[in-house]
Amino acid sequence: MKLNDILSNNFNAEEWEAKGYQLPQYDIAAVAKKTHDEPTWVHFGAGNIFRAFPAAILNDALNTGKYDRGVIVVESFDYEIIDKAYRPYNNLSLLVSLQSNGTIEKKVIASITESLKADKQFGEDWARLVQIFQAPSLQMVTFTITEKGYSFNDADLARGLDAVFAMGKLTALLYERYKAGKLPVTLQSTDNCSHNGDHVKAGVKAYAERWVKDGIVEAGFLDYINDSSKVTYPWSMIDKITPRPHEKVQAMLAEDGFEDNETIITEKHTFTAPFVNAEEVQYLVCEDTYTNGRPPLELGGALYTTRKTVDEVETMKVTTCLNPLHTAMSIYGCMLDYTLISAEMADEDLRAFIQKMGYIEAMPVVTDPGVLNPYEFIGTVINKRLPNPFMPDAPQRIATDTSQKLSIRFGETIKKYIARGLDKSNLVLIPLVLAGYARYLKALDDNLKPFEPSSDPLLAELQAIVAPLEVGKADQDYSCLKNLYIRKDVFGLDLYEAGFGEQIEGMVKELFAGKGAVRKTLHKYVSAR
């Protein structure tokens, strides 16, 4: 069983379906031809998340029979992905959805009709990209290039139309669209960063302004990219975990007789494969401001709404329903020697910790965006997403840059309690997370063995504050904690001023009592809620 079998005249669909493989319900060749002749959607970033989510929901939309165009994928950084994971398989891939009960769902994705390398050194590919950007039919360009992918610098701005960064290449292609008649298009980031459309806009604007200043392009081009009737940069909220190809999944596919199961590691250290494995749960909420129409991705489950609502969904996720739970688990998980989030969910204290913190303390001030139910969202996080045995997420990864995350993930909830005049005594487990951070900074686990704290720009500075404290030492002076918990840059507010300083100090004393004190303190406060 190989992906390319699907395109052959004597393809045995029954064999695949008998083994649980969901096959495309549309004419793959007809969709490819229509897309080639009248392209509507180009996507930058050929990584795993693209195939697992945007391409997959388009595949679902095509399966309804109500749409007839695919997506053209473009890679601007790691060209080996195109050469090794796309073209040998005629752009087909297998999506393996990892269920929280340990089973998998298998679906062949055939919605990607072309794969191109965005670089002038690949002359044919670049010429095809120019042709696509000149096409009146083009509606949107989307991106999963990570937050760093939107960056630019003076050296690249100075390269003019030969820029090598993704935003520079995009702007050069937009200039072709401008010259073809100032044709409308929407540039839609689907990267997991707040206000993501602004990253695209900032990049395009920086290149366009520089090129106008340098006399490379006419001033009208800058007017074009700033004209919201021509070019828009909507926000979106995307949420789906797509780990690198999983050995367990490879073994399951091999057992089926599916031969395209090898992992590909590129020279740039991208992990890819002809298959992509991802969690079953997914959310894509997009600001509905498109200047030239858009593919009907709502047929595959995408939600379209206002910018305000997209922001509210992001706020719900980041300040209440997902990210705070992650950080609480990561701080205590590291001290309790866990290396997998899913394993932490089998620990009664830790599971109850995030459950009670989320439902009892954070949910009373949750932002309800309307398009997603916060209670359903957090319930899915606790019951499906975090316990998923296929998710290789580690508390050590999530603990990276914790000092930069605490103000948004916990400070915002505390501020809402204060602003609304709510009973601050309802906050017990959130202060326990913040107290746990002081203990985490000592880099000793609950058995008093050293561990390597995750990288953090303020790590050395904050460790120096708690340096006078020793775990297990009786009658020590904890006044140094004030220098930590007054830090508005870390917590979003002065926790002493807010009335939580003494409470947190008391918890820190308990956590520092000695060997086993982290577990004992956690159990005490969680059980009492």
Pin down the residues of each PLM region.
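Substrate/ligand-engaging "lid" and interaction regions
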Residues: 1-44, 48-529
